[in-house]
From Swiss-Prot:
This is Ras-related protein RABE1e. Residues 182-218 are annotated as: Disordered. GTP binds at residues 22-29, 70-74, 128-131, 159-160. The lineage of its organism: Eukaryota, Viridiplantae, Streptophyta, Embryophyta, Tracheophyta. It is found in: Golgi apparatus membrane; Cell membrane. Keywords: Cell membrane, Golgi apparatus, GTP-binding, Lipoprotein, Membrane, Nucleotide-binding, Prenylation, Protein transport, Transport. A lipid is attached at C214, C215 (S-geranylgeranyl cysteine). InterPro entries: P-loop_NTPase, Small_GTP-bd, Small_GTPase, Small_GTPase_Rab. Belongs to the small GTPase superfamily. Rab family. It comes from Arabidopsis thaliana. PROSITE patterns: RAB (PS51419). It is a lipid-anchor. One of its GO terms (cellular component) is Golgi membrane. SMART domains: ARF (SM00177), RAB (SM00175), RAN (SM00176), RAS (SM00173), RHO (SM00174). One of its GO terms (biological process) is protein transport.
Amino acid sequence: MAVAPARARSDYDYLIKLLLIGDSGVGKSCLLLRFSDDTFTTSFITTIGIDFKIRTVELDGKRIKLQIWDTAGQERFRTITTAYYRGAMGILLVYDVTDESSFNNIRNWMKNIEQHASDSVNKILVGNKADMDESKRAVPTSKGQALADEYGIKFFETSAKTNQNVEQVFLSIAKDIKQRLTESDTKAEPQGIKITKQDANKASSSSTNEKSACCSYV
């Protein structure tokens, strides 16, 4: 079950953890850097293990702190990656539109999600490097959309190089997660517990400690 977002900090209302997964070389790190720092580099360095960036955005008047984890795509690092599935509230499955094998492997990554992530985790399919010449494209847009439809998830084609749809894909999944969490909170509200005045005092004194603890999965 997804961990509830921390809301006790002064600089944000929600803390949402996102995970970027996909084969090595599909551009996960480039997407992350473009979204977090608005930078792009042609020099490619393979991610070793796990790295993350943070960016705070505003959605519907709420400050959303996005903690975005970039994972290594190599087989030998998948055991490291699986430990980070559990706390993820949203997962971006990334493939390279010029590399058909990276697209075909999305099904394997989806199996990993089903095995290790929360049942309620939000997912989105991302076809990266959409700026490449059509002669180099190996995966048609229609094929990506068909796979997304099969899984019942949203689909975007992006380019970290030109910044095509990068902002949109991250904000889209963040908005869907916020909506899910808000609906979950609303449903939980009627399930109150009657407490005595003594219990209330105890709860009040302990709430500060609880609120100061950020998400345990960070």
